[in-house]
Every structure is written in structure tokens, then in C-alpha cells.
Amino acid sequence: MVTIVLGAQFGDEGKGKITDLLSQSATLCCRAAGGHNAGHTIVHDNITYDFHILPSGLIAPDCVNLIGTGTVVHLPSFFKELDALKAKGLKDAHERIFISDRAQVCFDLHSVVDGLEEASLAGKKVGTTGKGIGPCYSDKAARRGVRIGEVLEEGVVEDNLRKLEAGYRARFGELNYDLEEEIGRFNEYRTKLQPYVVDQMTFLAKYRSSPSILVEGANALMLDIDHGTYPYVTSSCTGVGGAIQGLTLNPTSIRSIIGVVKAYSTRVGSGPFPTEQNNAIGEKMQTIGREFGVTTGRRRRCGWLDMVMCRYSNSINHYTSINLTKLDILDDFDEIKVAVAYKLDGKRLESFPALPGVLDKVEAEYVTFPGWKSTTMGITRWEDLPANAQRYIQFIEREMGGVPIKWIGTGPARTHMIEREV
């Protein structure tokens, strides 16, 4: 049976920790979409691991890992990340990671184009990670991309890469890019990559009867190409639909869909953010929460928890349970606010706006809670939480239509987690 872990907000919710926890009993852990633009940090046995393209199930010694068909794979990053895990003691990681032969190749050329496209937007930049994800997915949709399986065939990458480079040069002029160097590197990858490449359908068939398959979502619903705050989104489907499509999952095999919700809100890059706090409150969240992007190092914008957004996210992903993260970051706030509705020109909106221009103008309507002003760091039992923290959590559950908050993060370590019987 399949468990899917998905971000319910703008990403950076802390999906890696619950994935790490669940992967200890999983047979298989998979990435379904996205690329090395994702970033998960996991603290395990006092060692900090940063994951980007690799599934974080690699930390679990008995868990096999798959990078699925819906992803885009930057091979230099793949091998660099794998080497970093080995250096930190995961010596057998290379034996437990596989890539679908139908996944797309993300080239250095795509990163160059990403930067040029962002620059051309001037004051309306999307705020991408600059990793080339958007241009790679664009080439996939235009049917001119290169698949992982084609890297193993002599001459295929060179022919296609020369065509891609010529097309982008015709569009942008001379590029700050070494075509011959990248072609040469892929000639080396032709042999180096071979042990990792699999036919996803055949590979997954071996695990169909597995009691525990874990899907690790990347980014989050509000960055989904269809359902997010378009155009300030990533270029893949980040919700449950993307997981099913990217891994060819049987929908009837899905046992649970876990929505990961940070106890406050953050966003990296441009785009509307109705509950953003451009003030001392936002600065305090940023400082205490160490809100810097794992992938880019950029400062994350911070604000109050937005239940309008979370309800919208739930209506698309249909969460069966919630993992609330980073509760401890709110320990020292005198009062805590939660957005429960949007108003535009004094009138409550009935649905989540599709247009970014409307989202930029809405006024958030808040419910205010007294803070608990005591530490929750490291608490592992519900009954040990301060009463005001319990009320805050129960309110979120009600606002989510009764979806239970089963896990509550109270610190960075794997052990800093409350698991409730719900």
C-alpha cells in the first residue's frame, strides 16, 4: 500500500522529517516529480543530511529508492549528492537508488537559459531557483527533451544537445555556456549511469504487493503548475495527481495522503503571500526558524498560518492526516494569528482566487490566539504540550474540516515529534 507525503503550502514545510520517519518501515521510497530544485534537511544520529534530487529514504538502511518518470534529473547533482551521502557514512546508498529511464535529463544549458529567462522578466521575475527546472520541463512539453535512458545510447545526447543549444542561441544570442564540455561529460556518464537506470514499470511491478511504499512529494501544492499561484509556481505537478502520474500508481493502492503544514507560513521567491509579515514578527519567525532555503540559501518570507490556503490545498489533495511542523518556533510569541478568510473590497471571498493580482489585494481576516510562552522543544507527548498550544492545534484541525493532525514537530531531530492516536 502507498503513503504519499505532500507539502500543503509553499514548500519548506519540513516534509523530509516525516518522510525519514516513515521510510524506516518502508520497502520503497520514491520521488515522483520535480528535480534538484527541491530541498530537504534531515538530522539523523546528530548528522545533518541535505537532499535535493535523491529521495530521503536513503537514510533508512533497508529502503530502496526510486527517482520516477515525472522527474527531471541533473546528473552532476545526482552524483555529487550521492558522493556526499557516502562521505557522511551511507556507504551503500549507491546500491539502493534507481532512476526511471523515462525521466528527463536536466542539462547545465537549462540553468543558463533559466537565468536568461528570469532576467528577461525584469520587474516580474518568478523567483526560480535557477536550477533549469522550468526550461527542462518546457523542452519535455515541446518534445525536444532527452530522457535518462537515451544517455546510455552513444551519440543521442550529443545530437540533441547541439540542437537545443542552437535553438537557444538563436533566441538569446551567444550563451555563457560550454557545449563541448557538457557533451564530454555525458560521454563519461554513459557508462557511469548504467547501474542506476531501470524501466519503471518493470521495477515497480516487483513492489506491487509491498506493505509500505512511500512517495516523497517535492515543493508543495501552492507551487503546482496547475493549482498553485500561477505564474509564481514551479513547472511540475506537485500534488497527488503528480504523484500518481509520475510514478504510474494505481489510485486504489493509496492508503494515506499526509499533508505537511508548517505552524506558520513561509515562501521563497516572488508571488502573492496574503499573510506575509513585513515587520518585526516576520523577522522573528525568520530568525528563530532559521528560514533560509536549503537549495538556494535565500531568505524565506514569513507570515501567519493561512487556513484559506490550507483548506484549498486539502480540497485538491484530500489529505487523510496532517503533520504539523515547527510548532516550537512559535513558543515565544505573545499572540499567534491564523487567517481564516480573505476579504476583497470589504467582502468575503467564497473561494481561493486564481489570479495573482487578486491575491495581492486581498485582506486576511484573522483569529487571534494567546501564545503559550513556554518551550515545546523536544516534547513527544500530546499531554505535555501547553494548553494554548493544544487549542491552537485543535483549531487548525477544525479549520481543515476535521482532518486529524497525527504528527506534531517540536524540533529538528527525528525524535522531536509527537505522534497522536487519531
From Swiss-Prot:
InterPro entries assigned: Adenylosuccin_syn_GTP-bd, Adenylosuccin_syn_Lys_AS, Adenylosuccinate_synth_dom1, Adenylosuccinate_synth_dom2, Adenylosuccinate_synth_dom3, Adenylosuccinate_synthetase, P-loop_NTPase
Domain of life: Eukaryota
Cellular component, GO annotation: cytoplasm
Chemical reaction(s) catalysed: IMP + L-aspartate + GTP = N(6)-(1,2-dicarboxyethyl)-AMP + GDP + phosphate + 2 H(+)
Biological process annotations from GO: 'de novo' AMP biosynthetic process; IMP metabolic process
The protein's required cofactors: Mg(2+)
Keyword hit for S-adenosyl-L-methionine: no
Residues at which IMP binds: 12-15, 37-40, 129, 143, 219, 234, 298
SMART domains: Adenylsucc_synt (SM00788)
Protein purpose: Plays an important role in the de novo pathway and in the salvage pathway of purine nucleotide biosynthesis. Catalyzes the first committed step in the biosynthesis of AMP from IMP.
HAMAP family xref list: Adenylosucc_synth (MF_00011)
Family according to the record: Belongs to the adenylosuccinate synthetase family.
Protein name from the UniProt record: Adenylosuccinate synthetase
Lineage of the organism: Eukaryota, Fungi, Dikarya, Ascomycota, Pezizomycotina
